[in-house]
């Protein structure tokens, strides 16, 4: 189905659907596609037939792993949607989609309210200043409570909710919503699955009597919030005049786009209720590419020189590659957001991040994993391109004669590793291909060679992340491999400063020798600092020639990678080169690199080195009767309980627990609570390992 790409950017919305893992995000997206006429049959997540979940494992596990991009039309607006995963192991997918969106719909579970993962995704959206509307889903669920969910948006997210609708009925009796702008009731008829039109039709009625007082109260709050944001409206409001519907809508739009408040709507995507008014809200309140600030970047040779690009098809071409995926027929698909200008298939563009020219092959607008070919791409839209061989996630593509480097994305380092060993020589080649393709797609998937064991190790953001990557290797790339037990990504650091550590590297063997003398001071950096390593040059009077200074820095960094105590990389160090000496003939870059490496080993041993481990923020929701067992179990895993609170019929326990103690936790939790408790965890910080535990790890690593 060929769809036109809208050139009037006022009528374009680039949005993401974001939420906790089970809030019903993919179902909501499916309904959007159904009502906007792209899907003629509804896909259900629990049937494994969902359009947006197109990878085999997504359909099996019923969770969204990669963010599929889709374009659809509502009234005469074009909505480009990215469906993002809600599982914490896939933060990279959420980060990269938020980077290129203009707005988002945050989906909440009407029974659970704001859950840990919703909080994480919300904070990521704050980081990129993405305006949002909230959709309280699953209003048909037992125990659903709209007002509780609105309270948690305030209390857990610290956000200002702007309630635009109230639910009519609850649980099985949920039939529709009160629209507080028009002060009418919207009611969906039909059975629980909707009638023949699958909830596509709803009736506008008068507000039920039992809701009239509450609706009037919430309407007043809404009008007051809108009036406060605009002096003219405030005057009108204080003068006792009614605000018109258009004025209220314009006020809500202003509050939303500036992220001062977040409109809240409700419904049940699964029961086909409330989706169309939510689409109206996307169009009415979320920004177009013209409403957001110009995208910033810097000049190719000077990071200090700030440059901007405006959403204008006639401007110089600038786009950001935000995802790379393997396609069964086309090979590598690169998803890009075009910020300014336009480009045609077959044209050359510049990858200004890498300084390489790229030729664009075919261009598509995507519908999940189906492609709609287009001849030209232009500002304000999201596309997929083929033929970009050197482009990876976070790279900028720009006009060769007017280059810019857009702000890239930063991704967290992996916290968990497994060794992977191909079964045959043929598998070795397949494994190399798989690793190359998967690491191009996913920047949080890392590969390294363990020098001691000679094994290939892959790293990721959690057990589920690595499970799925290994599963993809077997399924998509037909790799047969043995996979080891998960290993924790420990780190090392120093705790005290050491002043002026001397090291002289001297070697005299026939012909020219090697000579380098350095004096370096080391001090610890806080582990939450932006940079975990700093190098300063405080040498005066040319005692170490300028050309050798980077070699000292590289030598120190090389030694840090090899560790002090147990061979784990060292972080949190500031090194200052204070003094040194050189020889006209025998000094070289290599000699100073070796001296840098050795002075670090010497200094670090004296600087009270310690082992660090990743701590995970764990949240457990458990019925009250199992609370004691859950807390006792977390304590036995060296957990520190942070808080306990009541949340709709269950207890919520928050704790910080070392990752090394969390393997296999889900099985233990199920057996202790008869399967009634659920948990989520995400990386929090690195923390010092207790002495007794550290000694065990060090001995094991040294093979003692």
Swiss-Prot record:
- Coiled-coil region(s) at which residues? none
Q: Which GO terms describe its biological process?
A: ribosome disassembly
Q: Carries keyword Cell cycle? A: no
Recorded GO MF terms: GTP binding; GTPase activity; translation elongation factor activity
Annotated InterPro entries:
EFG_II (IPR041095), EFG_III (IPR009022), EFG_III/V (IPR035647), EFG_IV (IPR047872), EFG_V (IPR035649), EFG_V-like (IPR000640), EFTu-like_2 (IPR004161), G_TR_CS (IPR031157)
Q: Which UniProt keywords apply?
A: Cytoplasm, Elongation factor, GTP-binding, Nucleotide-binding, Protein biosynthesis
Is this entry keyworded Protein biosynthesis? yes
Mainly resides where? cytoplasm
Q: Which of this chain's residues are annotated to bind GTP?
A: 19-26, 83-87, 137-140
Q: Where is the tr-type G domain?
A: 10-290
Recorded GO cellular component terms are:
cytoplasm
The record's subcellular location field reads:
Cytoplasm
- Family as reported in the entry's similarity comment: Belongs to the TRAFAC class translation factor GTPase superfamily. Classic translation factor GTPase family. EF-G/EF-2 subfamily.
Q: Mind telling me which NCBIfam families this protein's record contains?
A: EF-G (TIGR00484), PRK12740.1-5 (NF009381), small_GTP (TIGR00231)
Role according to the record: Catalyzes the GTP-dependent ribosomal translocation step during translation elongation. During this step, the ribosome changes from the pre-translocational (PRE) to the post-translocational (POST) state as the newly formed A-site-bound peptidyl-tRNA and P-site-bound deacylated tRNA move to the P and E sites, respectively. Catalyzes the coordinated movement of the two tRNA molecules, the mRNA and conformational changes in the ribosome.
* Name the record gives this protein: Elongation factor G
